[in-house]
Amino acid sequence: MTKQPHLGLLTCIAAFAAIVTIPPDVAHAQDSLKIFISVDMEGIGGIGTGRMTSSSGKDYALGRELMTAEVNTVVAAVFEHGPADVLVNDSHGDMQNLLHTQLDPRVQYIQGNLKPLGMVQGLDDSFDAAIFIGYHARAGT
């Protein structure tokens, strides 16, 4: 996988912000945090054209690598904070974009678009934090 060190800083800041806003009593009352991550593609660092986000695009393979690398950067930041249970939900297009064989093995992964709750499938009130990666503004705005 291509290393993208310039992507890591902003992604880590976002993940850290999500983690540090967890109330201390919650963070210390349990052995590990439960973190939900939903990842879209158009807002991923390095994604610049539709050719990188469409499965028929000539640069889609690179887009998938960038998406997977950004998720792994966030996951690494979560685990630097301490033990965690992390659920990652692929939320772009047909929801089968992340390179699951390259995802951090400590995560659980949901893929495929047959999910009743789509982009938030798996999220419930048992999670301590939700992190949304790669999301974008509405088309045409």
Tell me the role of every PLM-derived stretch.
Residues 105-124:
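A glycine-rich helix N-cap at a beta->alpha junction
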Residues 58-90, 94-98, 106-108:
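Alpha/propeptide regions of enzymes that mature by internal proteolysis
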Residues 36-48, 52, 63, 67:
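N-terminal glycine-rich anion-binding loops that anchor highly charged ligand groups
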Residues 8-24:
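Bacterial N-terminal signal peptides
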Residues 27-30:
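Boundary at the C-terminal end of the N-terminal hydrophobic targeting segment
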Residues 38-39, 89-90, 130-135:
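Short beta-strand segments
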Residues 120-141:
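Internal, conserved structured core segments that host functional sites
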Residues 1-6:
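N-terminal secretory signal peptides that target proteins for export/translocation
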